[in-house]
Structure formats: C-alpha cells, structure tokens
Amino acid sequence: MGPRLGVWLLLLLAALLLHEESSRAAAKGGCAGSGCGKCDCHGVKGQKGERGLPGLQGVIGFPGMQGPEGPQGPPGQKGDTGEPGLPGTKGTRGPSGVPGYPGNPGLPGIPGQDGPPGPPGIPGCNGTKGERGPVGPPGLPGFAGNPGPPGLPGMKGDPGEILGHIPGTLLKGERGYPGQPGAPGSPGLPGLQGPVGPPGFTGPPGPPGPPGPPGEKGQMGLSFQGPKGEKGDQGVSGPPGLPGQAQVITKGDTAMRGEKGQKGEPGFPGLPGFGEKGEPGKPGPRGKPGKDGEKGEKGSPGFPGDSGYPGQPGQDGLKGEKGEAGPPGLPGTVIGTGPLGEKGEPGYPGGPGAKGETGPKGFPGIPGQPGPPGFPTPGLIGAPGFPGDRGEKGEPGLPGVSLPGPSGRDGLPGPPGPPGPPGQPGHTNGIVECQPGPPGDQGPPGIPGQPGLTGEVGEKGQKGDSCLVCDTAELRGPPGPQGPPGEIGFPGQPGAKGDRGLPGRDGLEGLPGPQGAPGLMGQPGAKGEPGEIYFDIRLKGDKGDPGFPGQPGMPGRAGSPGRDGQPGLPGPRGSPGSVGLKGERGPPGGVGFPGSRGDIGPPGPPGFGPIGPIGDKGQIGFPGTPGAPGQPGPKGEAGKVVPLPGPPGAEGLPGSPGFQGPQGDRGFPGSPGRPGLPGEKGAIGQPGIGFPGPPGPKGVDGLPGDAGPPGNPGRQGFNGLPGNPGPPGQKGEPGVGLPGLKGLPGIPGIPGTPGEKGNVGGPGIPGEHGAIGPPGLQGLRGDPGPPGFQGPKGAPGVPGIGPPGAMGPPGGQGPPGSSGPPGVKGEKGFPGFPGLDMPGPKGDKGSQGLPGLTGQSGLPGLPGQQGTPGQPGIPGPKGEMGVMGTPGQPGSPGPAGVPGLPGAKGDHGFPGSSGPRGDPGFKGDKGDVGLPGKPGSMDKVDMGSMKGEKGDQGEKGQTGPTGDKGSRGDPGTPGVPGKDGQAGHPGQPGPKGDPGVSGIPGAPGLPGPKGSAGGMGLPGMPGPKGVAGIPGPQGIPGLPGDKGAKGEKGQAGLPGIGIPGRPGDKGDQGLAGFPGSPGEKGEKGSTGIPGMPGSPGPKGSPGSVGYPGSPGLPGEKGDKGLPGLDGIPGIKGEAGLPGKPGPTGPAGQKGEPGSDGIPGSVGEKGESGLPGRGFPGFPGSKGDKGSKGDVGFPGLSGSPGIPGSKGEQGFMGPPGPQGQPGLPGTPGHAVEGPKGDRGPQGQPGLPGRPGPMGPPGLPGLEGLKGERGNPGWPGTPGAPGPKGDPGFQGMPGIGGSPGITGAKGDVGPPGVPGFHGQKGAPGLQGVKGDQGDQGFPGTKGLPGPPGPPGPFSIIKGEPGLPGPEGPAGLKGLQGPPGPKGQQGVTGSVGLPGPPGEPGFDGAPGQKGETGPFGPPGPRGFPGPPGPDGLPGSMGPPGTPSVDHGFLVTRHSQTTDDPQCPPGTKILYHGYSLLYVQGNERAHGQDLGTAGSCLRKFSTMPFLFCNINNVCNFASRNDYSYWLSTPEPMPMSMAPITGENIRPFISRCAVCEAPAMVMAVHSQTIQIPQCPTGWSSLWIGYSFVMHTSAGAEGSGQALASPGSCLEEFRSAPFIECHGRGTCNYYANAYSFWLATIERSEMFKKPTPSTLKAGELRTHVSRCQVCMRRT
C-alpha cells in the first residue's frame, strides 16, 4: 500500500504545481502588453471565491466545427423499448397466401363490350307464307313442239273433175298445192313422266292460310337463346274492315252470370297499337341454368394483386452479435432542455477549450497588493496604422493671442529633438476601469468615394403652391455682417457656359507701381476658350448665339417618369380630343335648340375639371415673373474646385462679333434683363381660360393668310426681352462733358463673382515700407512653396509653448529621475463577487483609461547622443494654437509666391479738384472706339431732350439670328384621300349576345343505328297458368311403353315367408357418458380367456322421413344379395333373331339414361392412384396447399379422386351445342361421396367428347364430409338416346362361363324377417399388448386408405352423435417459442455465495479514471514573476468551414444558366418548374427550393396512377407551368411545339450556401437593406402568387428566395400540356406585392390601372440575403 500512496501524492503535487503555474501565467498575461493603456492590472491572485449562482441559459450557439473522434465509451445499459420504427422498405414478394374463403357472389357486372359474332345459330323455324307478289312480265315464246300423231281420216270428198281427160286413160295428176291446215285434233293420251326439270324461279308467296287447329303438344325442345334480331320495318297498313251492321237489341231480363267459357281460338293479328314505350319492368325470376360453355383460352397473366393484409408478427429473432462502433454522428440540435440526469462518471481530461465570448463586466474586485516594479523595456515603434474613423467635430478653439510683427517665412522642419523624460505614472481613482478618452478633433475630409449606383426614381412630390404675387427684387435683403469662415463646401452646380481665358504663366510678384495713365484702346480680341467652371446662383450668363441645326438624333429609350414641373401659362383653346372610351349609359336629355354665339365673357375662376386634351402650340406669351427656385436637378458632372469668388472686375472691352456658332444647350431661365427700348404696342391677347393643358403635337404649317386690315393702336406693352446686340455703329463725334458732383458712398453691394484672371503685370517699382497693419484673419493654407535654400543655423530660440513634436529617435539612457510623489489613495472599492474556480481565459483589451494626475517634472537628463532615426510615429493630434512669439527680425525677401486671390474692390476715392479750363484744341483725328460708358440713370431726365439726332445710313449688317416661330396659319386645303390600309389584327371578341328566339322544331331524325344487345336479364316471374285447352280427338293407341321408373316405396306388406333378413341398420348414436376419472395404472394383467361373442344390439327406431336429398354420388358396389322372391312377370319382349353361341357374356344391360343432375362444381384434378393397396403410412404433417396448376390436356379416365373443395362461382358461359351421345362406359366401383356444399349456379359446359374406355379404377378414398348444400335448380331434361336396332335370333348357346357380376339390381320388396342365425365360432385369442403411455393429441393424419367396400345402403343415414372421447394422440412437435414476455419484477437479492478460492495475480490494470479533486492545499508563497514566453509558432491552417447544406435556387428567367451568387457552390442546373396541375388541382413548387429546378424538361413531367395498379402518362388534360423567358410569343398565337419550346423555358441553378438564406421586402420602390450581419445575394421584385387554368395555382412564401424574382414580367410563366404544346393564355395571372405609403396604411386603397411602361412604379422591391459566417 505504501508505494501506491506515494505515487498518488506525487501526482497530486504535480497537479497542484501545474495549477499554480497556469494561474500565475494567466495573471501575468493580463497586463503584459502595451495595449493595456494606463491600467495596472498586476496584483496577487485572491483566494478562490464561492461558487456563483448558475447563469441563465444562453442562446443556442452556432454549430461547432466537427471535433476529433472521441474514445469509445462503455456499452450503455439496455434501453427501453423504442417507439415503433418507420415502415421499412418493401420486402421481397412472399409466397402466395392460402386462398381466402369464397366471397359472397358479386353483383352482376357491368355489361361487357359487344363480343365477336357467335357461331351460326340453329336454323330457325320456317317463316310464314308470304303474300302473293305482283304478276311478272310474260315469258319468251317457247320452241316449236314435235310433230303430233297422225289425225283421224277426214270425211269423204266430192268426186273431182278431170280436165282434158281422155276417158279410159288413167293419168297421174300433178302434185297439188298444200291444202289449208286441218281442224285441230282431239287431245292425246298423257305421255310418260319426263325427267325432272330445273327448278323454277321462286313464285310469289301465297296468301296466309286460315289458322289450323291446335296441334298436339310437342316434346319439350331444347331452348337456346338466339341473338336478338334487328327490329323489323313497319308493315303496310291493312285494308279497312267491313262496316258493321246495326242491330236493334231489346233489353232482356237480367241474365244470370254464365259459367266461364272455354279458351277461344287465337284471333287474327290486330293492327299495331299506338302505345307509348312503357317503363322498364321489374326484374323477372332467375332463369334456368345454361349449359357449360366451352373451355376458354388461357388468360394472359394478371396484374400483381393488391398487397395482402399484414401477417401475424413473426417470432423474435436471435440476438445478434455486438456490432462495431459506428462513426461519431453529427452534432445534434438542442431542441429543449431535458431533465437533469444523474451525475456521470468523471470523463477523460478534455483538450484546452476555445476562447470564450467576453463575459459581462464584473463588479470591481478588491484591490490587490502592489506587485514589484517591472523592468521598463521600450517597445518597437509599430508601422503607421490605418487612418482612423472620422472623429466628431471638435469644440471651437479659444482665440489665439497675437503680438504684432511682420510674418516671417515658413522655416524648414528642424531635425527631430531628443525624447522627453518619461512621465510619472498617473493616479487612478481607485477603480481600475478604463474609460474612453475625449472625442478627437475633426479629421480631414476623406477621399471621394466611388460614384454610387443610379438611384431609383423618386416618389412623386406633393404639388407646390404657386406664388402668385412674388417680386424677387423686393425679397432680397441687405447684405449681412461678415460671417465666420465656413467649412469647405461641396462642389457647386455647374454654372453657365463662360468664355474660357488663356492661362497666363505665373509671374514674379511685382511691387505696386504708381497709377498709370489710361492706355489706348486695343483691338478686339479673338473669342476665348471656355473658362473654368464656377457657379453663383446670382449671376446668369447671356443667352448664347443660335447654332446650326444639328442632325436628328437616334430615338432615345423610354425615360423614367419625370417630376411634375411648374404650372405653365394658360394656352389657347385646344382642338377637340380623341374619342373617349364608351361611358356608362346616361339618362336621355332633351333636345335643345342651338343658341346664338355669345360674347366672350370675362375670365372665370379656375375650374377644377379634368386635364384637357393637348392643344396646338401657342404663341409666345409675355415674359413671366421669375419663378421660385426649382427642385435640385440631376447630379451633374464632378465640378472643378475653383477659388472663392472675388469682387467683380472692371468691365471688359466688347469683342467683335464672332461667326455664327452652333446652337447652345438650353440655358437655365435668365433673370430679367435691363429695360429695353420701347417696343411697338402689341395686340391685346384673349384672356386664357382653365388650367393649361399638356403641349399638343406640332401642327402642320398653314398656308400664309391674306394681309388683314391695320389694327387699332394697342396699350403700352410690357418691357420686352433684351434684344440681341446689334452690329457696332459708326464712330460718333466725341462728346464734351463736365465732371459730375461727388456721389455719396453706396450701400455695400452683394459680393460679386470672381473676376477672370488678369494678365501678368510687369515688375513694379518697389514701394516704401508700409506701417505695420493689424493682424489679418487666418488665411487658407497655401500650396507648398518650393524648397528654400539652406539658411544658417539660428540661435536656439526661447522654448515655445507648443504641441509635442514628432517622436524622435531614442536617446541614450539618462540618469534615473527622482521618484514622484505617491498618488492619492483611492477609495475602497466594492467587494467583488466570488470568482470561478479556475483562471478564466485572457480577456479583451480594456477601453482607454482616464488620464492620471500630472506628475511633477523630473530633472532634465543629460542630452543623449544622436540616435538612429526611428520608424515614423503615428501623427499626433492637431495642437491648440500657441501663444504668439515675439516678433522676429524681417527676413530677406523670399521668392515670388503664387499670386494671391484678387483683392476686394476698394472704396471710391475722393474726387480731385477741378483744373482750370484749357484752350480749345484743334480737331483731332477720328479716335478709336471708346470704352462703353456707364449706364446713365434715367432719374428726372427729360426723355425728349435725350433723343439724339438721326444718324447716318448704317452699313449692311450681318445676318440676324433666326426669328421665332410664326403663329399658326390658316388651315390648308384637304389632302388627297389615303390608300387603303392593311387589314388590322382581329379585335377582341364582342360581348355575349342576347339569347335568340326559339327555332322551328326540326323534322324527325333518321332512325338511329341498332343498339347494342342489352345484358342478359334475370329470368321473369312465371306466367299465370293457362286455361285448359279443348280436348283433342281420340289418338291412336300407342306402342307399348318402356319400362317404367322405379316406383315409390310401397306400404309394408304382410309378413312374408322366407329366409330371415340381414341385421338392421346401425342405430342412432347414444349420448356420450360423463368422462370417468382416470384410473391408476394397473399391473400387467395375465392373459384372459376369450370372451363370448356379444348379442346383437336392438334395432334403432326408424327416423322420420327427411326431405328427398339431391342425388348423391353412386355408392360402392354392394355384396351380392340373396336371391329375392319371384318378381311379377314382365311384359312380353319382342322376339329376337336367333344368335350364335356367344362367348363370355358382357356386362349387364345398359342402364336407363338418368335425368340430368344439377351441374356440380368442378373438382380439382386428382393425382393418379398408387397401384395396389399399401400399408397405411405414419401420419404426416398437414402440407401447405399448392397453387393450382395449368390446365393440361385431357388424360385417360383416372380413378375417381377425392371430391374437391367447394369452388368459387364461375362466370356464366354461353350455352354450348349439344354433344353426341357417349358410348356406354364400364361399370366402376363407386364411393359414397360427401354431400357437397351448394355451389353457385354455373353455366352448363359443353359435354366432352366420349373418352376411350378406361380400365376399372381403384376404389377412391373417402372424401371429407361437406356441408349440406341448398337444393339446386331443377336440371333441364336430357335428350332421349337413340333406340338400338333389334338383334338377330341367336342359336341356343353353349353354357358359358359365368359372366362378370351385373350391376346392382333394383331393390326388391322387403323380405320376411329371418330367424336368428347360429352362434359363430369363437375368434382366436389375440396377443396381449403392453400398456402404452398416454400421448399428447397428434396432428390430424392424412386420410387412410380406403376400406373394403361397405354394404350399399339406399338412404344415407343422418350423422350420428359424437362418440366417446378417443385415446390421446402421440406427443406433438415442439411449438415455436412464444412471444417475449413482459419484463419481470426485479427479484430479491440472493444469499451470498461461499467465498471463492484466491485467484492468480491479474495483469496490471488500465489507467484509472480521474479521481475526485482533493482538498485544497495550503496557500503557497508567491513565486517570482516569470519571463515573457517566446512567441508561438504559426499554427496549422484551420479546417475549412463546412457548408451546412443550406440550399438556394436561382432562376435566370432567360435561356442562360444562372451563376450561383458569391459565397455559394453550384450543385446542378435545370429548368424552372413553377407548378403542375392534375385532375384540375394545382400543386406548386417553392421557387427558392431545389424542387423547382428539374434537371430535365417535359411538357408533361408526371403521370398518374389509380388503385387498380394502372398508371397513365400524357393521357388527359393535365398541365405543367414553367418560368418563361422574354422570348416574344409568335404572331400567329399558335401553340409552340418541339424544339421551338426551348427558347421559352427559364433555366435555374441549385446552389449550396454556408448559412441561412432569406428574402426581405420593402413594399416600396426602394431596394431594402439586408439585416445587420447578412449580405446580399441578389435584388428583385416581390412575387407572391400565380393562377391559371381553372383559377388554380399556388404561391411563394415571402421569406423564401423564390418570392424575389430578379426580373419583373406581367406574364412570368408559360403553360404546357401533355400533348406536347406550350403557350401563353389570357387566364394566366401573376400577383406581386404592391408599394404602400406609410401615410396610406390604414386608409381605403385607391383603385388605379397601370399601363405598360409604368408597371414597375407600384411593384415592391426585395433583396435575397445570406447570413454572414
């Protein structure tokens, strides 16, 4: 234990020393430099004070730099269960789920689209016989027939005459001419039947026959619903019926109501009715089920289904291994102060912290004890600092004391003097607090700054009151007393353009000469160069000569709106204005008669009407009175600084007239000129009426009018403007005058403007020394003179009382001065608050201290040797004026100085005495032109005597100046009509017209196309039972019928005599007994003797007869029954032909065809059975249900499979055609299937073709019992099978081998009950088994193999009652682990264990954590002050500041990519998306965020999806809106497509900034300033909102940079559509912040409309600012 304690003591001592050393360094560092001023901050460090109160919570600081990676902390405790996490990403697709339960049958679907044409239907019935057609045209004549048979002999004719016959000779006569045709013979016998001729043309249909008698009821046919036929044409109306005959009916007695007659014959068809179409009927009953349809083709794969319901929560996974430590996270943002945690373990020692902010000033501490004196070490003189800020204006100094004396020349600056002795330290008032010094004197004016940007247009000023009666001559007062010299003024306004004098050289300064004689008159000089510019508002230059006309200038840009000018003089009446807009409709006025023209009335008071239209240019008005000074003009060019004005010089000689110069700029209005010569009287003008209108356009020059008659003499006019100077007249005779009397001295005049610089005079004669004048006022500082020659070294002067000189070079060390008296002891300060435990960081430099009391002067030191010159010191402040020294001796005359300003004009001298009158001289030569005389006074002088005689004819003068514009001429003749103009652009659409009158109803339309077939209706309700028909005639006896169907079960017969019957059916299940308590396990028993067989149980009572069930599946073949009693003899069969001896007999007779059963639901395809019968396997676990396989080709007939589960309802298929009758199949074994659930009614399918004869199948497994189904619909009757041919008579056969057992015969009548059978033999004794343990219930096994065929029972029994509880199954598999349980209650502390064995020595441990602070040690002795440390080496460059991911988006509103503002980095460029509109709803983007800058452009940048997993793109009327460029829209206003869209879409840039960005808005036309600490990124206009199609749109947050667009446009965006077009539309509006005057804040806004050119005068300006980092 000892060594370890020693180590701890050493560590503690080192820590204390380190702590003391750092405290001392901190104390010393407080006041070591020279920057502490006069504060002495040394002192002994006081004891550690009490801990202060906790301060207020500070504001959240800026995010710090990313620190270095910290050490890995210990693993934390297990946390509480967290909040549920965000939904994870979508997992991989799971296996198909178990099929759900069949849903309820759906509602009937919407009728589908028309299917393809079906197969040809069954031929329809013969149509009715048509009516007889019209008679056809006669046929062509037939061919000639064959010769007929010879006719009968004719009657005997008369004897003929023989002409020219010699009797006795027989002469043969000539052949006679053919005779006439004989009469037709009688018809011959009919000939043999000829061959069948070709079919003739279809004859016309005959008339309808009478209705036949009702036929016999036919067999029930197969009904197929054919397609609905088209609606037939309307038939021709029939002939009118016969008129009825009127009969007289006598009213008889009331008859009794007769019996209901028999149903009459069907009537003839009636005429078509005229009823309206009825309402749709109610749905009928359900129709009969159709046949199964054909198998459809395999469908295309379906779309992915909707997500299933969430599954059950999975089991908890195993706990994973501990992960590696992640990288340190970014510093989090403090959202709120959490609850105080428990005190943590002491951390590792931290690095030195950064310098903290300067803390608040503490209360003054207790004064420390004085420290030892420091060693004075003079510091190096620093380089000159930058000029300080301009100080405030100092107080005016005291007037200087002056002794008279001549002023000597300025001497050269002497060499720097030795430094003075050091002063005594100043006394403090006890509170060591540095106060700022007094304000310094005013510094010299700074360098002029860069010219500022052009300012915004000023706001319109208030209208000024006009000064109606102002005489400016009377307003000017007498001159005031001389004021003190003013500050140097700003440059004045530019003066009128003066003549420029030639610059003279600087001459030597001459002595004043005596008064010279007046010189001769010189020649007029040439026109001078322009002179220096000066400005005096009291002087106005003469009007310049008119110039040559200049070239027409280029058209200027549209200027900003100017300020309102002074009201002009009233103009003459203007021409009528242009047609105004259509006003509101006024009330109708009465028609007045035109009045006669009245006299011109006196001028009325000024009206307050609207500003009239622009009038023609008026004639020149009378000169106005001088106006009040105007508003300051625009900022002029920088003026040249000129000397202050001197007194006016003597008037110069007049120059000769120059050439006509160019026209000068328009001058400022001149002051009124001297009175001119009396002008001719002017005509009296018409008095003006109304306020002056704006100047009208320049009218066309009129034709010169005819000369008018001379006017009446007018009244005397006002003085005219001064005339232009005329050419010089001829030289007059010299006048003779007397000198006038001495005038009184005049009132001092207003100071004149400085005269022009005079010519250099020659050197004058030196004057006598004047008397010493009084001291003059301080003159302005002259320019520096040239350096003088080095004078001899003067004797040392009396020490002046002046300001301290510049710091000289350091002198050698002088002897130490005597100590000054101690300072006044300060008052005791307030006790300070206890300080913190550790020394704080070095504070900032304190403010300047109060000056201490001046110490007594020390003894002067010995003069030091000349030191090396020091660096120039900081210039000292300007000293106060010193006391004047005694006058020195006059110096030798210096070189000529710069000529002084011209002196003020001297007073008039006294007049000299008049001389005697001389003799008259000879007439001299004609003299030169004399100086112009002073203007004569016009007081009390007779104007008549002043007029001279008429002079000689003058020479022709030079061309006079251009005259003023003439007055308006008479109107000219009308011009030629102009050519037709081009057609204008279409106008705006007119207003909506009134609704028109209803039109005449149109003619009926053509019949519409055939409608599509309606959906299959539900079957109708059954119709009412028809009336019994008339009994038909007696039919012929029928053939013997087929064997009848099995009859109903007859009543029980009397007991028969016969063999005892079989045991009865199994009785009903008895009720289950109560479970017994389990017995104890018995001993193994010994083998018992075989028991007796039990007696058969009693027969159960017969159940009540149930409803007839639906036919079940055929049962298994029953055991061969005992021979029954003899049956009734059958009907005699037909005799067969004798047959040959047959082989082994075939299977029994073909059964009767059964009636169609209800179509069952289709079972799933069964697996092929195993051959043979195996041993039963172990029960397997229940497998998952497999997915349904594709439909295969039809296989061979398999063995019957397990009945399938209940299928879902299929869709209704079309009825299939009737199949051929199949071949008889072989008898198979049947299993009694379960009773199936009632399936939904399916469509009848096509009957399959007969398959090949399959082998007999194995007996099937017993199916699961289904739920009881509802009774099905009755099936349609099947078609009767064909009757077989009768066989031949067979020979008696040989005894054949026994045939296969025939099919089960019909059930015979019940037999007589039998006797009891004999007792069977006892069975063999079984082996005794071991008793097994009780197992857990097992899982349900697969169904076992089929048992042996059971006896066939006719009626399936009802289900029995539940049996007794079976034995327990085997132990099941282990279940999955259960869910995590709730956290248990903390257990109690266990008992301590036994002590363990002592372990081996452990490895040395790691360095322990910092222990708690020890108690403070005793106070140490003060150490000596340490020396100053060396300056540290330059630190490494700091890490660059991290951008904190502040994003800002800038839009150029042009096709150029914008630049990111300074201080930000580009991330990417894109296209400026403003908002999108889908499904008539808009969603906007904030233009200041990155979402408004899409990397790619499309007129339809989005698609839309629905819940059916279907998405559509560019398929309907959706829009997108983009910021646009100034590209003008095409003149055709057609939509823009393709590449032509590119110039219309604005580009944008997404930039990353190092700090927050926001927008500020001024709500004026001035650009707002960024807040303190923020810098500007760009300026713009305040954009708030936008809408377009359907009045939908969005807006910008005013704090976002997106609300400050750099360009103002009334249509800043363009609309694009999914069909690939873009355009501007009239329903697009943009909304901007307006300007608001402070005085208009809570008043009703004044409505106004701004036209193009003045839109920006009411839009607020804005600036986007970024916080400085």
Curated annotation (Swiss-Prot):
| GO CC terms in record | basement membrane; collagen trimer; collagen-containing extracellular matrix; extracellular space
Any Pfam family from its record, for instance, is: Collagen
Q: What is known about what this protein does? A: Type IV collagen is the major structural component of glomerular basement membranes (GBM), forming a 'chicken-wire' meshwork together with laminins, proteoglycans and entactin/nidogen.
| Covalent cross-link S-Lysyl-methionine sulfilimine (Met-Lys) (interchain with K-1651), where | M1533
GO molecular function terms attached to this record: extracellular matrix structural constituent conferring tensile strength
Propeptide spans which residues?
A: 28-172
Biased amino acid composition, Gly residues: 347-356, 586-595, 758-767, 797-817, 1011-1020, 1290-1299
Q: Where in the cell is it found?
A: Secreted, Extracellular space, Extracellular matrix, Basement membrane
Give the free-text PTM comment from the record. Answer: Lysines at the third position of the tripeptide repeating unit (G-X-Y) are hydroxylated in all cases. The modified lysines can be O-glycosylated.
| Source organism, top-level taxon | Eukaryota
Residues modified to 3-hydroxyproline:
P204, P207, P210, P587, P602, P605, P647, P1214, P1424
Q: Where is the composition biased (Pro residues)?
A: 196-214, 367-376, 413-424, 436-448, 1247-1258, 1413-1428
Could you list this entry's UniProt keywords, alphabetically sorted: Basement membrane, Collagen, Disulfide bond, Extracellular matrix, Hydroxylation, Repeat, Secreted, Signal
The Collagen IV NC1 domain extends over 1445-1669
Q: Where is this region: Triple-helical region?
A: 173-1440
Q: What is the lineage of its organism?
A: Eukaryota, Metazoa, Chordata, Craniata, Vertebrata
Q: Cross-link position, S-Lysyl-methionine sulfilimine (Lys-Met) (interchain with M-1533)?
A: K1651
User: What is this protein's record name?
Assistant: Collagen alpha-1(IV) chain
The family note in this entry says: Belongs to the type IV collagen family.
User: Low complexity: which segments have biased composition?
Assistant: 357-366, 396-412, 485-494, 847-871, 1030-1040, 1101-1114, 1193-1212
SUPFAM superfamilies under this entry?
A: C-type lectin-like
Sites bearing 4-hydroxyproline, chain numbering: P603, P606, P623, P626, P629, P632
The record lists the organism as Bos taurus
Which PROSITE patterns does this one have? NC1_IV
Give the comment on domains: Alpha chains of type IV collagen have a non-collagenous domain (NC1) at their C-terminus, frequent interruptions of the G-X-Y repeats in the long central triple-helical domain (which may cause flexibility in the triple helix), and a short N-terminal triple-helical 7S domain. NC1 domain mediates hexamerization of alpha chains of type IV collagen.
Q: Which InterPro entries match?
A: Collagen, Collagen_IV_NC, Collagen_IV_NC_sf, Collagen_superfamily, CTDL_fold
Describe, as the record does, how this protein assembles with itself and its partners. Answer: There are six type IV collagen isoforms, alpha 1(IV)-alpha 6(IV), each of which can form a triple helix structure with 2 other chains to generate type IV collagen network. Interacts with EFEMP2.
Question: Which cysteines in this chain are paired by disulphide bridges?
Answer: C1460-C1551, C1493-C1548, C1505-C1511, C1570-C1665, C1604-C1662, C1616-C1622
